[in-house]
Each structure stands twice: as C-alpha cells, then as structure tokens.
Amino acid sequence: MNVRTEARRPPNLRDERKLQTRQALLEAALELGRQGGSLASISLREVAREAGVVPTAFYRHFRDMDELGLALVDDVCLRLRQIIREARASARNAPDAAIQSSVRGFVAYVLANERAFEFLTRERFGASRPVRQAVAREIRYFSGELASDLRVAPPFSAMPGDDVEMVADLVVHTVLNLTADLLELGEGQPVREHEITARAIKQLRLIFLGAAQWRPERGAVPPPAAPGAPSGRP
C-alpha cells in the first residue's frame, strides 16, 4: 500500500481497527478461560495467539493481564447493568409477575452469554486481586442500586436503611447462586433449567414476603458479652 494513501486514510478507520483488535483480545481471554484456565494462569502470548495478533499488539491495549481482566469486568457488567436496570424498574414493588419475568429474562441472558458469566463467577474468587476486587465492587454496586430502589416503595420505605440493604444483599446473592447453578447445566437439560429457575423465583418470593412482615425491633442481635462477664446461663 502506498504510504501517502495510508497517510490520507481517515483516522476513524484506524480507530475502528484498534477497537476490533481490543475486542478480539477480550474475546480470546474469555474463550481461553472457558477452556479451563483462570485469568492468572493464562499468558498474554496465549491471548494474542488466540486473537490472531502478535504479542506486541497486546501492549497497545493493555499493560498486563490484570488490566485486561479489569476491562472484561467493565465490559461484561456494563451490559449486565442495563438488563438489571430494566428488571428493577419492572419489579420496584416486587409483584409476583415482575419477579417471574425478571428471573426468566435473566436466565435467558446468562445462557446466551455463558462465557462472560463464567468469567465473572470464576474470577470472583480468582487469584488476581485487582480483578477480584473489581468483581466485588460491581456486586456492591448492584446491591446498592437495588437498595436505593427499594427505599422509595412500601414496605421498605418504612424500614431502617441497614435492613433494606440486607434485603438487597439477599436478592443479589440469590441471583449469584442462580447464575452459578445455570453455568453448571449441560446442553439439553430443559427440565433441570426449569427447576433451577423455579427455585430462584420461589426464593425471591420468600425474601420479599418475609421482608414485608419484618419487624426491625424483633431482629436486633445483642452484642457479645464482654470477656469475664456472666453469660446469664444457670
């Protein structure tokens, strides 16, 4: 190609190719992870080879594998935030129909994006501390957003803030468990998929029904007795 032609090429074409290479590296890391490797066990050379680029191209996008992992967390969770935002909007008052539709929609999304959710589930307890912290931060974000929504609707609007946050945490961890169960499914197991989905729906119903009957004054946990203090037992 003529050098002058290259110089006249619109800059957006170069940017587009750069974005394509970056995405190829992210997809390569997800694929290698699915083949059984955690992020900490995958080398950047393996990622570059899987993406079809030379290793030096990796450094044009990421300093190291930790930075690639952080980009993956951002990329996956950015898409997930929109799904959860829509679910929160429809389930603000936790009607039964909204719980069912939200769970079924989430199940479909997980099964359509298994590699991404396998990455989040695996790296939540992975060896890379920066990535592990990023996943934990996203989980706290989802829980905090849900708590903010719940606070504006009864019965949660009358509950102490800590209790609302506890309900949100229960919901988020139920969804995390649902995700892990779905990822263990093999292909062609519709009955098991239905069982997992139905159980999650029932668990969320129980959480919201229980929260509606919650009395904060009855749920107080007394502090531990000071060392040497009488236990009150005979």
Regions of interest found by a model, annotated:
Residues 1-20, 158, 215-234:
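N-terminal intrinsically disordered/low-complexity leader segments
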Residues 17-29, 47, 72-80:
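Generic hydrophobic, amphipathic alpha-helix propensity
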Residues 24, 35-67, 71:
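Helix-turn-helix
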Residues 66-79, 83, 120, 134-135, ...:
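Alpha-helical DNA-contacting segments of helix-turn-helix folds
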Residues 112-130, 147, 180-184:
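Amphipathic alpha-helical segments used for helix-helix packing
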